[in-house]
């Protein structure tokens, strides 16, 4: 028996063949009249999203999913997720990054900061906590011999990025002392980007790319982390035409083919001019980019603790239902490749998930293991929250990161 449980609104579906308005309307609404009802509705949301996306949802899914619950709350900061996913990331760097990422709470693009002066996707913890966590991170970055495994140009680049990280953290601490919310958030992003670059340099010099099946060897592959800037044309909440930037980070360590294919299309200008096809409270999806020679991109999901990803199948179909992906749908602005429900290995567009990460508890997000996550929005979440169907991507370009095409 299959179930379809609804949340407070209709959910959009991804890609051709993933569903219809009639099917979406079949999801029953849950009236939020009490905290208990709201909590049940939030748990149900994970099931409903998957149901309307055309995924099979067995009746025992909640019992199975309880086996997947982690021992700690899931990480919802996109940059922290990416840093933790870097192979061979040094402990001092990971710990510094987690200290920095912990000062904000991640939301859905419309949080007002504690000072009230900025619209943001992040909320701030207490000022004393921010100062303490930033000081702890600076202490981790101030140790001796941290980059001893590197030499030559790699060493020079890593040392420069280490100074960039420390500069951003000092500015972050000073901003907290002055209670400047926007400056804390902007310097957090800058500092974590610098730390991610250092981790990527170390990893790319100490590890090899993850193996991929021979049948996919000719597809573009990315090794490392690449930053992509989307310039989008849209209207503000007041209706004024404007343009804004959304910064993405692609993870070629964990999803070499998916991220590589996305980055290759960006490099070739295939996303320039694409329209936003679907937008609602849950997701934003683009049109499918036109290619001279379309290639099928297999679904690609790396499971925690494994050296190579699963290809061509969902985790449930692979018998890995209880395993957790390295790149989960935990963060606002998770970027994934779309595909029809009846073909996990077809060429598709991409979509962003816009749900508040606190709305779906860990272990109950049924998008995990059914779609290939490519990366995350690391800046510009408020622009993402303003996008509507009919808006467009003016341009997409690679703007930074540490990566190679292989």
Question: Can you say where each PLM-predicted feature lies in the sequence?
Answer:
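Acidic/proline-rich low-complexity IDRs
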Residues: 10-13, 17, 52-54, 61, ...
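The N-terminal extracellular segments of secreted preproproteins, especially immediately downstream
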Residues: 26-27, 47, 88
